[in-house]
Amino acid sequence: MPKLKTRKAAAKRFKATGTGKFLRRRAFRNHLLDHKTPKQKRHLGTKAVVDRTDVERVTLMMPYA
């Protein structure tokens, strides 16, 4: 059986943790930041765990993660 290819778009967006979960970047921190509070912007800078409903899709895109 041939090797499975990693979807590079997903590899750039997600990072696997040691426990098998995936981390992702949060949305809404690219532009239009003037009206957001410093606390909001600081929180948006942290990583978030991919929801359990999406884990299977991410795993299929990154078979060796």
Curated annotation (Swiss-Prot):
<dbReference type="GO" id="GO:0022625">
    <property type="term" value="C:cytosolic large ribosomal subunit"/>
</dbReference>
<dbReference type="Pfam" id="PF01632">
    <property type="entry name" value="Ribosomal_L35p"/>
</dbReference>
<keyword id="KW-0687">Ribonucleoprotein</keyword>
<protein>
    <recommendedName>
        <fullName>Large ribosomal subunit protein bL35</fullName>
    </recommendedName>
</protein>
<dbReference type="InterPro" id="IPR018265">
    <property type="entry name" value="Ribosomal_bL35_CS"/>
</dbReference>
<comment type="similarity">
    <text>Belongs to the bacterial ribosomal protein bL35 family.</text>
</comment>
<keyword id="KW-0689">Ribosomal protein</keyword>
<dbReference type="GO" id="GO:0006412">
    <property type="term" value="P:translation"/>
</dbReference>
<dbReference type="InterPro" id="IPR037229">
    <property type="entry name" value="Ribosomal_bL35_sf"/>
</dbReference>
<dbReference type="GO" id="GO:0003735">
    <property type="term" value="F:structural constituent of ribosome"/>
</dbReference>
<dbReference type="InterPro" id="IPR021137">
    <property type="entry name" value="Ribosomal_bL35-like"/>
</dbReference>
<dbReference type="InterPro" id="IPR001706">
    <property type="entry name" value="Ribosomal_bL35"/>
</dbReference>
